[in-house]
Amino acid sequence: NTMAPTAKGTIIDNELIPHVIKSIAAKDDITAVKIVSSRMLLATGFLRKVFEIFETFNTSIDMVTTSEVGVSLSIDNKMHLTQIVEELKKYGTVVVEENMCIICVVGDLRWMNVGCESCITAALHDIPIRMISFGGSDHNISFLVREVDKKEALQALSYHLFSPKCDGSKAFEKSKSCKRSCLKSKL
């Protein structure tokens, strides 16, 4: 518990324990911005132009995902959102979703730990996920969900990753690697 690091039962350290999920964190008041543009397909410099708009308005980007014709990202500063959206509209259709939340699972998530990310994602099987960010770090996977789904998402992750009642069978009974990951997370 980062709000009570000295509380009984709480252990916070930076030691890497192989195959173990260490914590779950959440960040509220996030805004998702999605830009869809057929001009992005095979276009050089499109992302640079998008990022320059955010830089111009001194607005940091928390998460980003891309596809052939679109980019989705999240920000936690809406001060210049109107101006940013107007600039982005020059490049395509812009959709803004407010009242979002980033949920981050932290631990040993190296790509060779097969099944860990699927175990985490399976725990959220009833939660609408807007965006997933994974691969930029070996230590976390982040999900963008609606703030109204935050409590349910945190409870599901906590139960499936840390609860002594969890035998790895709830949302992912057929995955041996999920069972293994869930059980190891309780160390």
Where are these regions (language model features)?
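C-terminal catalytic "cap/lid" subdomain
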Residues: 1-136, 140-187
